Amino acid sequence: MKIEKSFTVVAPRENVWEFITSPESVAPCIPGCEQVEQVGPKKYRAGIKIKIGPIRTKFKVDIDVLEERPPEFASYQTQGVEGGKASRIKAVSKLSLTEIDSAATEVLYTSEINLIGRLGKFSQGMMNKVADSIGEDFILALRKEIEVAGES
């Protein structure tokens, strides 16, 4: 499954980069993210609760930073298992920041996701709807945090 989102944040690119590449800052913006901890250089672990159809579950995920080119590009690999190991997820994500002007930044996010196990059996349509909803909630929370912080 491929996810691609593009949105604008009213803040300078350096501010967006600093926020979005800080796990402590960005984690509260991710729907269902309970905690994030650094487990090594450029390596993080998180717990994420999600709901897909009638199933509520939690994934334990490991995130590795594959590449960073501040303040314009980063790529990540995420791997995780659902509690009870009923499902596995693997994703490669890319984040690009483009300066629109000194006060606005375009964010482009793409992710190739492979989900196997019981959750992988859900129809592609349902998975896309869940991913889209999570993405929209993330964008709203991220904008609020960055744009409100920029006003103070």
Question: How should these model regions be labeled?
Answer:
Residues Q38-V81, D137:
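Glycine-rich portal/gate segments that line the openings of hydrophobic small-molecule binding cavities
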Residues V16, V26, V65, V107-Y109, ...:
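Hydrophobic pocket/interface hotspot
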Residues R118-S152:
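A conserved amphipathic terminal alpha-helix motif
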Residues M1-K49, E151-S152:
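Hydrophobic ligand-binding cavity/cleft-lining segments
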